[in-house]
A protein has these predicted regions:
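C-terminal segment of N-terminal export signals and the immediately downstream linker at the start
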Residues: 23-57
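Short, acidic/polar
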Residues: 47-58, 114-124, 217-223
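Acidic/histidine-rich catalytic cores of soluble enzymes
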Residues: 65, 166-254
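Glycine-rich, proline-tolerant flexible connector loops at the mouths of alpha/beta enzymes
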Residues: 68-90
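Conserved, mostly hydrophobic/aromatic
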Residues: 38, 58, 66, 93, ...
Length: 300
């Protein structure tokens, strides 16, 4: 990614001739520095079949960033990363000109018993891949199924502790939402409200899954306005125009991504990862279609 100095040099302008406000300049930088990423869960079956070919195809489409997932056993990703250890994957990503800004890590054990040993091992993996964010992909099963105010407060405490551990190891902790966190609990609170309130803004960022936010009936822009700067990453995936439970390629559904992307600075967005949980066409055609829409219409 280009530095601020590189941007000015390549634009052929200097500070003396820069007749735009700092806020506009920041928006230009956000756009010029935005690498479009993909959550690799989108092509999980293809990775299991041929990790090298799949990553090459991802790079050929134009993606520059990938978000990994790790710790889910043979069915999801085999040993390590589809038979590769972290060093081998890091080298393969480098070969294809890919970087990994974030990784999803299986934190079920930690969120259940508070044991940090697995976290420490996974943090080593994240650092080997030069990732910036260690991302908790889902809530503890008991809280997901039977969430309470106290349950979410306990999760917030565990997030803060994990966030401190990540910070001490050069990473930032993030949490990836689904729709259930927005269900109303006691005193008209939601689980997401509690996580926002009870976690340290310096220790936890959120990876906002736009699909699940809209599925829950929540306006993403309202979240940005109420919690400015907390949504460092987004999962960008679209929703079928007739069925809010069906995924579709970005730009073909009902989610107003143009307005959402206009508010990236307000959200604090640093990374975007295209994702589609279920695909009904050739997966590489699908992700190429979503990539093309994002590049041509959302990232200038």
């Amino acid at each position: 990614m280009n530095s601020r100095r590189d941007f000015i040099k390549k634009s052929g302008i200097g500070f003396a001739g820069l007749l735009i406000t700092p806020s506009i300049f920041n928006n230009i930088l956000l756009d010029s520095k935005q690498d479009i990423g993909i959550q690799l869960f989108t092509v999980r079956e293809q990775l299991n079949q041929d990790v090298k070919l799949t990553l090459k195809k991802i790079a050929d489409i134009g993606f520059k960033q990938v978000e990994t997932f790790y710790g889910y056993g043979d069915k999801m990703s085999g040993k390590g990363f589809w038979g590769l250890d972290a060093k081998e994957l890091a080298q393969l990503l480098k070969t294809y000109g890919l970087k990994s800004g974030s990784g999803h890590y299986n934190t079920t054990q930690y969120l259940t018993d508070g044991n940090t040993e697995v976290l420490k091992q996974q943090i080593e993996v994240a650092n080997t891949l030069s990732q910036k964010y260690y991302t908790i992909p889902a809530m503890a099963p008991n809280v997901r199924q039977n969430g309470t105010v106290d349950g979410y407060k306990k999760m917030a405490d565990l997030f803060n502790k994990a966030g401190e551990l990540c910070k001490n190891n050069g990473l930032t902790l993030a949490y990836h939402n689904h729709a259930f966190e927005f269900a109303t609990l006691e005193h008209k609170q939601t689980g997401f409200d509690i996580l926002l309130k009870e976690t340290d803004i310096k220790l936890l960022k959120f990876e906002l899954d736009i699909f699940w936010v809209v599925n829950a009936g929540i306006d993403p822009i309202t979240l940005f306005k109420q919690n400015e700067g907390r949504f460092a990453m987004w999962h960008v995936k679209d929703m079928d125009k007739t069925d809010n439970k069906v995924f579709t390629e970005v730009g073909t559904g009902r989610i107003d991504y143009k307005t959402i992307f206009e508010n990236r600075k307000l959200a604090g967005n640093k990374f975007i990862f295209i994702e589609q949980d279920v695909i009904k066409k050739d997966p590489f055609e699908s992700i190429a279609q979503s990539f093309s829409y994002v590049k041509q219409n959302l990232v200038k």
